[in-house]
Amino acid sequence: MKREEKKLVKNTLLLMLGNFSSKLLVFLMVPLYTSVLTTAEYATSDLLTTTINLLYPFATLMISTAVMRFCLDKCKDSRQLLSIGIWIEFIGIAFVALGSMLFFNSGNLQGYRYYFLIGFAGYSLYTLLMEYAKGSEKVGMYSIAGVCNTVALISCNIVFLLKLGLGIKGYLMAM
């Protein structure tokens, strides 16, 4: 095999490790969630998680994907790209924080606003840094970060849900 083909195979396997293993392990956590959380708590947590995933592309203008794409262009200053990406992410997080004052003001979601904001900010910055790692061709770092994130998520879920019995708040803190 040629050098480029070996690199492609290696990078593909590392990306698969970083993505697939994380998704599989989180999928295997579903029985824990359904046994510890009530139906209403699980529905609320799913609503918050889905809302984060839906808001992210609009609030951040998908800057993480742009950072990855332009990092791959060798003539660009990748640190400057990351800096711009972080600024745009913070602006998006600020808009989401303002909007959340209306959304979380009443109803069943009262009391979850700060969990939502921290979850959104964490997801946004994590996604940006992961895309930056991919764009900088640091595929090994990308995979290690994905696995570490999954291990931290599972560990926090076990501690917060099983050991401390924090229910939905424990689930959201682990998120």
Model-derived features: positions:
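Interfacial/gating helices of multi-pass transporter permease domains
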Residues: 30-54, 168-171
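Alpha-helical transmembrane segments and their helix-entry boundary regions
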Residues: 15, 42-43, 81, 139-145, ...
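Transmembrane-helix boundary and interhelical linker motifs in polytopic inner-membrane proteins
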Residues: 2-6, 34-41, 55-90, 134-140
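Hydrophobic alpha-helical transmembrane segments
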Residues: 114, 144-175
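Residue-level recognition of pore/gate-forming positions within transmembrane alpha-helices
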Residues: 19, 23, 50-53, 89, ...
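N-terminal membrane topogenesis motif
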Residues: 1-25, 76
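Small-residue-rich midsections of specific transmembrane alpha-helices
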Residues: 19, 24-29, 46-71
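Alpha-helical transmembrane segments of multi-pass membrane proteins
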Residues: 54, 58, 90, 94, ...
